[in-house]
């Protein structure tokens, strides 16, 4: 069964992760996201809380961005604060050194620390 445009749109996170991003630019992103029917907008946690309504899209934030090399406790605190400020989803950057070095027990512990900090939020592990 082929996917419709709306089916595909609901799988997309519309992102604005430039370090100089402003609330005005995020507002434009949210307007575009609502017009396109995408799932969420993803922004840096420093932009939270957002001073406007999101309409029908969810709010995602990055965690440990962009390197993933942050300490697990820092990632967990960053994620928890973002969720407390309105984030529905957390896109956590995986520590590439651990993954590339086959240190998957560290990768798992890192993800687990963030998961435990935000049990009610959607958590995605991403590679940058």
Where is each model-derived feature located?
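An N-cap/entry alpha-helix motif that binds or orients negatively charged groups
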Residues: 2, 9-46
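Active-site mouth loops of central-metabolism enzymes
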Residues: 7-23, 60-76, 97-103, 126-128
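A general structural detector for well-ordered alpha-helical segments in enzyme core domains, enriched
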Residues: 25, 29, 78-82, 107-114
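Glycine/Thr-rich beta-alpha phosphate-binding loop at enzyme active sites
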Residues: 36-37, 42, 94-101
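Active-site cofactor/substrate anionic-group-binding motifs, chiefly glycine-
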Residues: 38-89
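Short beta-strand segments at enzyme active-site cores
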Residues: 42-44, 88-94, 120-128
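Alpha-helix-loop-beta-strand connector modules within alpha/beta enzyme cores
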Residues: 45-67, 102-126
